[in-house]
Amino acid sequence: MTDQPVSRTALVLFSGGQDSATCLAWALQRFAHVETLGFDYGQRHAIELDCRDALLAGMTSLRPDWAEKLGEGHTLAIPTLAEISDTALTRNVAIEMGEGGLPNTFVPGRNLVFLTFAAALAYRRGMTDIVGGMCETDYSGYPDCRDDTIKALQTALNLGMDKQFELHTPLMWLDKAATWALAHELGGAGLVDLIREHSHTCYLGERGARHDWGYGCGECPACRLRAKGWCEYVARAV
């Protein structure tokens, strides 16, 4: 995670979740202009997209300098991803472990598709810096979250578009507790509280049950990782 020249512009993959909200704050701290990109791909937890407005409003209120840097927000609909994916993230089926130790929430190629679309949009808008919340420390084992995958894709995108894109993954080597700590480092308790209250992680789209770490079913893999990270973050902060 190196600081970038303030004159550069970044495109942040922003779903409305904890990780992408933290990455947005990270980008706003480092770049002169930041735009966001979300994807509506038929996910069960599409409510995450609705959470983005509250997060953006909270961040710009929290830090006026961030408000000056924040630019256009984009949303791309790619329903085909759900149509070709028989997963618990795109179908109303129980979440369980599949073959090879991967949960059936894994959507094959999702991050590859997201980053390719992001690069195409960045190309059109004259950007070369793309920020994503991929992580292979506290994660569900998804192969498209791994550092070697992201580096390989960066090479492919640069060759395929004849550009010098840089794919930033500031959370790659952080566990969930460290991700909470990074949010505090970037925006203090105000940002941590904003992410707790308004970001969405739960794969089932549950926002009726409130926990110390935020809203969710508390049982899906995403909720368990978020809850575990929150407890460890609080313990480390004592």
Swiss-Prot record:
UniProt source species: Nitrobacter hamburgensis (strain DSM 10229 / NCIMB 13809 / X14)
Keyword annotations of the record: ATP-binding, Ligase, Metal-binding, Nucleotide-binding, Queuosine biosynthesis, Zinc
Record's cofactor remark: Binds 1 zinc ion per subunit.
Keyword NAD applies: no
Enzyme class, broadest EC rank: ligase
The keyword Signal is assigned to this record: no
Family: Belongs to the QueC family.
One Gene Ontology term from the biological process aspect of the record: queuosine biosynthetic process
Gene: queC
InterPro entries: QueC, Rossmann-like_a/b/a_fold
Cofactor: Zn(2+)
Annotated catalysed reactions: 7-carboxy-7-deazaguanine + NH4(+) + ATP = 7-cyano-7-deazaguanine + ADP + phosphate + H2O + H(+)
SUPFAM superfamilies linked to this entry: Adenine nucleotide alpha hydrolases-like
Binding annotation for Zn(2+): C202, C217, C220, C223
Name this polypeptide is given: 7-cyano-7-deazaguanine synthase
EC number: 6.3.4.20
Residues annotated for ATP binding in this entry: F14, S15, G16, G17, Q18, D19, S20, A21, T22, C23, L24
